[in-house]
Design a protein with these regions (language model features):
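Short glycine/serine/threonine-biased micro-segments
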Residues: 2-4, 12, 47-49, 110, ...
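Gly/Ser/Thr-rich active-site loops/lids in small-molecule metabolic enzymes
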Residues: 65-70, 119-140
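A generic structural signal for short beta-strands and their flanking turns/coil linkers
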Residues: 83-85, 99-101, 124-129, 173
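Glycine-rich phosphate/pyrophosphate-binding beta-alpha loops
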Residues: 49, 104-119, 191
C-alpha cells in the first residue's frame, strides 16, 4: 500500500496511490516477479545513490517537515552549493575514475513522485541502470540532468567515454564502486551507512509483487 513520501516502487509497478484501490489488488492483481539488488550486505528493490541525492535524503530524514515541498527545497539548496566526489567504477571488465555529483543505481524507472533519472530502467529486465553525473558547471548540470530525465539513452561503458561524457548512463548486472571520500549513501530513498567500497549485484526474480 503506497503510504510513503515518494512511493516510487508503487508508481513504477502501476499500483494506485488510493489505498482502497491498492487493496483491491489483493483480489484482482497479478503477482508478478520483480528483481531486486544487493549493495554489500544491504538489499534494495528500487534504487540506491551516492552523493548529491543521498545528501538530500539524509537531510530530509531529519527535517522537521516532510512532503514534496520540503524535498524540493532541500534539493534546490544543495544544487547551488554542489559537492563533487571522487569515484572508481568497475563494470563489464571496464574500470573508470571520475569526479561526480552523484551516482544512481536503479532497478526502477521511478525515483518517486513521478521523477525519473533512469528512464529505461525496468523492474524485471535482469539489469541495473547506472547514471553517473560527472563534474560540470551549474548551467550545464541543470541542462544535462533535465535532458537525462526526458530522454536518457543507454551508453556502453568504456574507458574512452567513462569520464568524458557529462552524464554516463549504462546497464550492468553487477558493478563495484570505490568511494574514498565516503560520499553519503541512500537505499530506496532512506539514508544508509556509506562505505569506501560497494559491491552491487542484481537479484533476478527476487520476489513477487501484486500489481495491476
Amino acid at each position: 500500500i503506497p503510504m510513503g513520501s515518494g512511493n516510487g516502487l508503487a508508481l513504477a509497478a502501476g499500483i494506485p496511490r488510493n489505498a482502497s484501490k491498492a487493496l483491491d489488488l489483493i483480489f484482482k492483481g497479478n503477482a508478478a516477479y520483480i528483481d531486486s539488488f544487493r549493495i554489500n550486505s544491504a538489499f534494495s528493490c528500487m534504487l540506491c545513490g551516492l552523493g548529491f541525492d543521498a545528501l538530500v535524503a539524509h537531510e530530509f530524514a531529519t527535517h522537521a517537515s516532510r512532503g514534496l515541498a520540503t524535498y524540493v527545497k532541500l534539493t534546490i539548496r544543495n544544487f547551488f552549493k554542489p559537492t563533487f566526489y571522487p569515484f572508481g567504477i568497475e563494470a563489464d571488465n571496464t574500470s573508470i575514475q571520475t569526479n561526480a555529483l552523484f551516482i544512481s543505481i536503479a532497478n526502477s524507472n521511478q525515483f518517486g513522485n513521478n521523477f525519473t533519472i533512469a528512464p529505461k530502467a525496468s523492474l524485471n529486465d535482469g539489469l541495473l541502470d547506472i547514471v553517473v553525473v560527472n563534474k560540470m558547471n551549474k548551467l550545464s548540470l541543470l541542462y544535462k540532468i533535465l535532458k537525462q530525465i526526458r530522454a536518457g539513452e543507454v551508453n556502453i561503458l568504456s574507458e574512452e567515454t567513462g569520464d568524458k561524457k557529462r552524464i554516463l548512463y549504462f546497464q550492468a548486472k553487477k558493478l563495484a564502486i570505490t568511494n574514498p571520500s565516503q560520499a553519503p549513501l541512500h537505499i530506496d530513498g532512506e539514508p544508509a551507512k556509506t562505505a569506501t567500497r560497494l559491491n552491487i549485484e542484481i537479484i533476478e526474480n527476487a520476489f513477487r509483487l501484486l500489481q495491476p
